[in-house]
Protein backbone atom coordinates (compact mmCIF):
# COMPACT_ATOMS: atom_id res chain seq x y z
CA UNK A 1 0.00 0.00 0.00
CA UNK A 2 1.25 3.51 -0.84
CA UNK A 3 2.38 5.79 1.98
CA UNK A 4 -0.22 8.42 2.86
CA UNK A 5 1.73 10.38 5.48
CA UNK A 6 2.78 14.00 4.90
CA UNK A 7 4.49 16.65 7.03
CA UNK A 8 2.57 19.88 7.57
CA UNK A 9 4.67 22.69 9.04
CA UNK A 10 6.79 20.27 11.07
CA UNK A 11 3.92 18.08 12.30
CA UNK A 12 3.47 14.61 10.81
CA UNK A 13 0.01 13.69 9.49
CA UNK A 14 -1.04 10.06 8.90
CA UNK A 15 -2.74 11.29 5.72
CA UNK A 16 -3.35 14.68 4.08
CA UNK A 17 -7.16 14.78 4.42
CA UNK A 18 -8.54 17.53 6.68
CA UNK A 19 -12.22 18.43 7.16
CA UNK A 20 -12.50 22.19 6.62
CA UNK A 21 -13.59 24.64 9.27
CA UNK A 22 -17.32 25.22 9.47
CA UNK A 23 -18.21 21.79 8.07
CA UNK A 24 -17.08 19.57 10.96
CA UNK A 25 -18.13 21.42 14.13
CA UNK A 26 -15.68 20.80 16.96
CA UNK A 27 -15.13 17.22 15.81
CA UNK A 28 -16.79 15.33 18.64
CA UNK A 29 -20.15 15.65 16.85
CA UNK A 30 -18.78 13.32 14.14
CA UNK A 31 -17.10 10.94 16.60
CA UNK A 32 -20.45 9.16 17.06
CA UNK A 33 -20.40 8.24 13.34
CA UNK A 34 -16.83 6.94 12.94
CA UNK A 35 -13.39 7.04 14.55
CA UNK A 36 -12.26 10.57 13.68
CA UNK A 37 -8.66 9.55 14.45
CA UNK A 38 -8.66 8.19 10.88
CA UNK A 39 -8.36 11.83 9.75
CA UNK A 40 -5.03 13.56 9.21
CA UNK A 41 -6.42 16.29 11.45
CA UNK A 42 -9.36 18.69 11.14
CA UNK A 43 -9.92 22.43 11.31
CA UNK A 44 -12.50 23.23 13.96
CA UNK A 45 -15.30 25.78 13.75
CA UNK A 46 -14.18 29.37 13.14
CA UNK A 47 -13.55 30.94 16.55
CA UNK A 48 -13.67 34.63 17.42
CA UNK A 49 -12.74 36.67 20.50
CA UNK A 50 -16.38 37.22 21.49
CA UNK A 51 -19.46 34.99 21.00
CA UNK A 52 -21.25 35.47 17.67
CA UNK A 53 -24.85 34.58 16.94
CA UNK A 54 -24.37 34.61 13.18
CA UNK A 55 -26.45 36.06 10.38
CA UNK A 56 -30.26 36.06 10.13
CA UNK A 57 -31.90 33.09 8.38
CA UNK A 58 -32.17 31.79 5.71
CA UNK A 59 -28.42 31.23 5.57
CA UNK A 60 -28.17 28.46 2.95
CA UNK A 61 -29.06 28.36 -0.76
CA UNK A 62 -28.67 25.29 -2.95
CA UNK A 63 -26.98 25.65 -6.34
CA UNK A 64 -26.06 23.39 -9.22
CA UNK A 65 -22.87 21.58 -8.11
CA UNK A 66 -22.59 23.56 -4.89
CA UNK A 67 -24.19 25.71 -2.23
CA UNK A 68 -24.09 29.25 -0.85
CA UNK A 69 -23.82 29.84 2.89
CA UNK A 70 -23.90 32.98 5.01
CA UNK A 71 -23.72 31.53 8.53
CA UNK A 72 -21.79 34.53 9.83
CA UNK A 73 -19.16 32.79 11.98
CA UNK A 74 -21.62 31.68 14.66
CA UNK A 75 -19.56 30.42 17.62
CA UNK A 76 -19.49 30.64 21.43
CA UNK A 77 -16.29 32.76 21.59
CA UNK A 78 -12.75 31.65 22.42
CA UNK A 79 -13.20 31.45 26.22
CA UNK A 80 -16.08 28.98 25.90
CA UNK A 81 -14.36 27.04 23.11
CA UNK A 82 -11.41 26.46 25.45
CA UNK A 83 -13.53 25.76 28.54
CA UNK A 84 -16.29 23.62 26.98
CA UNK A 85 -15.57 22.45 23.42
CA UNK A 86 -11.91 21.39 23.54
CA UNK A 87 -12.31 19.16 26.65
CA UNK A 88 -15.04 17.20 24.80
CA UNK A 89 -12.74 16.84 21.80
CA UNK A 90 -9.86 15.47 23.90
CA UNK A 91 -11.99 12.45 24.80
CA UNK A 92 -12.35 11.31 21.18
CA UNK A 93 -9.48 12.85 19.14
CA UNK A 94 -5.91 12.02 20.08
CA UNK A 95 -3.97 14.07 17.54
CA UNK A 96 -3.09 17.76 17.17
CA UNK A 97 -6.07 19.76 15.90
CA UNK A 98 -6.16 22.86 13.70
CA UNK A 99 -7.76 25.92 15.32
CA UNK A 100 -9.51 28.21 12.85
CA UNK A 101 -9.50 31.84 13.98
CA UNK A 102 -11.45 34.84 12.70
CA UNK A 103 -11.41 38.47 13.78
CA UNK A 104 -12.63 41.95 12.97
CA UNK A 105 -9.48 43.83 13.97
CA UNK A 106 -5.79 42.95 14.19
CA UNK A 107 -6.15 43.00 17.99
CA UNK A 108 -9.03 40.48 17.81
CA UNK A 109 -6.89 37.99 15.88
CA UNK A 110 -3.93 38.39 18.25
CA UNK A 111 -6.10 38.00 21.36
CA UNK A 112 -7.80 34.80 20.15
CA UNK A 113 -4.56 33.24 18.89
CA UNK A 114 -2.75 34.02 22.15
CA UNK A 115 -5.51 32.22 24.09
CA UNK A 116 -5.42 29.17 21.79
CA UNK A 117 -1.61 29.10 21.84
CA UNK A 118 -1.80 27.82 25.43
CA UNK A 119 -3.88 24.79 24.41
CA UNK A 120 -1.72 21.68 24.12
CA UNK A 121 -3.98 19.92 21.60
CA UNK A 122 -3.92 22.84 19.17
CA UNK A 123 -1.21 22.01 16.63
CA UNK A 124 -1.74 24.79 14.08
CA UNK A 125 -3.53 28.12 13.94
CA UNK A 126 -5.45 28.59 10.69
CA UNK A 127 -6.12 32.31 10.45
CA UNK A 128 -9.07 33.26 8.27
CA UNK A 129 -8.33 36.69 6.78
CA UNK A 130 -11.58 36.77 4.78
CA UNK A 131 -13.29 38.76 7.57
CA UNK A 132 -14.21 42.45 7.16
CA UNK A 133 -11.79 44.87 8.85
CA UNK A 134 -14.00 47.10 11.03
CA UNK A 135 -11.20 49.68 11.20
CA UNK A 136 -10.51 49.52 7.47
CA UNK A 137 -13.85 50.54 5.99
CA UNK A 138 -15.21 47.00 6.17
CA UNK A 139 -12.87 45.65 3.47
CA UNK A 140 -11.73 42.08 4.04
CA UNK A 141 -8.19 41.72 5.47
CA UNK A 142 -7.55 39.09 2.82
CA UNK A 143 -8.11 41.44 -0.12
CA UNK A 144 -5.15 43.68 0.76
CA UNK A 145 -1.56 42.37 0.98
CA UNK A 146 -0.64 44.96 3.62
CA UNK A 147 -3.62 44.16 5.88
CA UNK A 148 -3.10 40.39 5.51
CA UNK A 149 0.59 40.81 6.39
CA UNK A 150 -0.32 42.94 9.42
CA UNK A 151 -2.59 40.20 10.79
CA UNK A 152 0.09 37.57 10.10
CA UNK A 153 2.80 39.53 11.93
CA UNK A 154 0.52 40.25 14.92
CA UNK A 155 -0.40 36.58 15.31
CA UNK A 156 3.21 35.39 14.93
CA UNK A 157 4.18 37.63 17.87
CA UNK A 158 1.84 35.82 20.28
CA UNK A 159 2.28 32.17 19.32
CA UNK A 160 4.95 29.53 18.85
CA UNK A 161 2.56 27.29 16.89
CA UNK A 162 2.62 27.15 13.08
CA UNK A 163 0.45 29.92 11.60
CA UNK A 164 -1.43 29.09 8.38
CA UNK A 165 -3.16 32.00 6.65
CA UNK A 166 -6.44 31.12 4.92
CA UNK A 167 -6.93 33.24 1.80
CA UNK A 168 -10.01 34.49 -0.02
CA UNK A 169 -10.31 33.83 -3.78
CA UNK A 170 -12.30 37.06 -4.21
CA UNK A 171 -9.21 39.03 -5.21
CA UNK A 172 -7.37 40.14 -8.35
CA UNK A 173 -3.93 38.79 -7.40
CA UNK A 174 -3.93 36.01 -4.78
CA UNK A 175 -0.20 35.39 -5.29
CA UNK A 176 0.70 38.91 -4.09
CA UNK A 177 -1.31 38.37 -0.90
CA UNK A 178 0.23 34.93 -0.26
CA UNK A 179 3.74 36.34 -0.71
CA UNK A 180 3.00 39.24 1.66
CA UNK A 181 1.86 36.74 4.32
CA UNK A 182 4.97 34.61 3.78
CA UNK A 183 7.21 37.67 4.19
CA UNK A 184 5.35 38.57 7.40
CA UNK A 185 6.22 35.16 8.86
CA UNK A 186 3.38 32.80 7.88
CA UNK A 187 4.31 29.12 8.18
CA UNK A 188 1.74 28.02 5.60
CA UNK A 189 -1.09 29.17 3.33
CA UNK A 190 -4.52 27.56 2.96
CA UNK A 191 -6.74 28.33 -0.01
CA UNK A 192 -9.31 28.84 -1.31
CA UNK A 193 -12.04 30.07 0.98
CA UNK A 194 -15.51 30.36 -0.57
CA UNK A 195 -16.26 32.51 -3.61
CA UNK A 196 -18.87 35.25 -3.32
CA UNK A 197 -22.22 34.16 -4.75
CA UNK A 198 -25.93 34.97 -4.81
CA UNK A 199 -29.25 33.29 -5.69
CA UNK A 200 -32.66 34.90 -6.22
CA UNK A 201 -36.08 33.50 -5.31
CA UNK A 202 -38.14 34.03 -8.49
CA UNK A 203 -41.48 33.99 -6.63
CA UNK A 204 -40.47 36.50 -3.97
CA UNK A 205 -38.17 38.46 -6.31
CA UNK A 206 -35.70 38.68 -3.46
CA UNK A 207 -32.37 37.05 -2.63
CA UNK A 208 -32.79 33.56 -1.15
CA UNK A 209 -30.27 34.33 1.60
CA UNK A 210 -31.24 36.98 4.17
CA UNK A 211 -27.73 38.43 3.90
CA UNK A 212 -28.26 38.66 0.09
CA UNK A 213 -24.82 37.21 -0.72
CA UNK A 214 -22.77 34.37 0.73
CA UNK A 215 -19.88 31.99 0.23
CA UNK A 216 -20.22 29.69 -2.78
CA UNK A 217 -18.61 26.27 -2.31
CA UNK A 218 -18.84 22.75 -3.72
CA UNK A 219 -17.56 20.91 -6.83
CA UNK A 220 -18.25 23.89 -9.13
CA UNK A 221 -15.33 25.86 -7.65
CA UNK A 222 -12.79 23.00 -7.81
CA UNK A 223 -11.05 24.08 -11.07
CA UNK A 224 -10.63 27.64 -9.71
CA UNK A 225 -9.16 26.22 -6.49
CA UNK A 226 -6.70 23.99 -8.38
CA UNK A 227 -5.55 26.97 -10.46
CA UNK A 228 -4.99 29.18 -7.41
CA UNK A 229 -3.24 26.42 -5.43
CA UNK A 230 -0.93 25.89 -8.41
CA UNK A 231 -0.16 29.62 -8.69
CA UNK A 232 0.45 30.17 -4.98
CA UNK A 233 2.43 26.98 -4.31
CA UNK A 234 4.83 27.86 -7.14
CA UNK A 235 5.31 31.40 -5.77
CA UNK A 236 5.96 30.69 -2.06
CA UNK A 237 8.38 28.40 -0.23
CA UNK A 238 6.00 27.51 2.64
CA UNK A 239 3.49 24.61 2.55
CA UNK A 240 0.08 25.11 0.98
CA UNK A 241 -3.20 23.46 2.01
CA UNK A 242 -5.54 23.13 -0.98
CA UNK A 243 -9.31 23.28 -0.68
CA UNK A 244 -12.39 24.22 -2.66
CA UNK A 245 -14.82 21.69 -4.10
CA UNK A 246 -12.80 18.60 -3.14
CA UNK A 247 -15.16 15.62 -3.07
CA UNK A 248 -13.22 12.43 -3.88
CA UNK A 249 -9.78 10.79 -3.63
CA UNK A 250 -8.93 11.80 -7.21
CA UNK A 251 -9.52 15.44 -6.26
CA UNK A 252 -7.03 15.08 -3.39
CA UNK A 253 -4.39 13.71 -5.77
CA UNK A 254 -5.07 16.53 -8.25
CA UNK A 255 -4.73 19.19 -5.53
CA UNK A 256 -1.44 17.67 -4.38
CA UNK A 257 -0.08 17.51 -7.92
CA UNK A 258 -0.97 21.21 -8.22
CA UNK A 259 1.19 21.90 -5.15
CA UNK A 260 -0.81 21.20 -1.98
CA UNK A 261 0.90 19.43 0.93
CA UNK A 262 -2.48 18.69 2.55
CA UNK A 263 -6.08 19.00 1.37
CA UNK A 264 -9.19 20.27 3.15
CA UNK A 265 -12.67 18.96 2.39
CA UNK A 266 -15.60 21.27 3.08
CA UNK A 267 -19.06 21.14 1.47
CA UNK A 268 -18.75 17.39 0.83
CA UNK A 269 -19.06 16.82 4.62
CA UNK A 270 -22.48 18.49 4.56
CA UNK A 271 -23.66 16.18 1.78
CA UNK A 272 -22.13 13.03 3.28
CA UNK A 273 -20.84 13.08 6.90
CA UNK A 274 -18.57 10.12 6.03
CA UNK A 275 -16.97 11.99 3.08
CA UNK A 276 -13.48 12.43 4.58
CA UNK A 277 -13.34 8.88 5.92
CA UNK A 278 -14.40 7.51 2.52
CA UNK A 279 -11.82 9.64 0.69
CA UNK A 280 -9.00 8.44 2.99
CA UNK A 281 -10.00 4.80 2.53
CA UNK A 282 -10.12 5.24 -1.24
CA UNK A 283 -6.71 6.92 -1.57
CA UNK A 284 -4.70 3.63 -1.73
CA UNK A 285 -6.82 2.48 -4.70
CA UNK A 286 -6.29 5.75 -6.57
CA UNK A 287 -2.56 5.76 -5.76
CA UNK A 288 -2.23 2.23 -7.13
CA UNK A 289 -4.15 3.18 -10.28
CA UNK A 290 -1.80 6.11 -11.00
CA UNK A 291 1.36 4.27 -9.83
CA UNK A 292 1.98 6.57 -6.86
CA UNK A 293 4.15 5.04 -4.10
CA UNK A 294 4.07 7.93 -1.64
CA UNK A 295 1.98 11.09 -1.59
CA UNK A 296 5.10 13.15 -0.88
CA UNK A 297 6.45 12.33 -4.34
CA UNK A 298 3.54 14.03 -6.12
CA UNK A 299 3.39 17.33 -4.17
CA UNK A 300 3.82 20.08 -6.74
CA UNK A 301 4.65 17.49 -9.38
CA UNK A 302 2.94 19.46 -12.15
CA UNK A 303 5.23 22.18 -13.47
Locate each region found by the language model.
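Short acidic/polar active-site loop segments enriched in Thr and Asp
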Residues: 39-40, 45, 95, 122-125, ...
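Short gly/pro/ser/thr-enriched loop/turn and capping motifs at secondary-structure boundaries
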Residues: 48-53, 132-134, 196-199, 270-272
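Alpha/beta enzyme core
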Residues: 104-241, 250-265
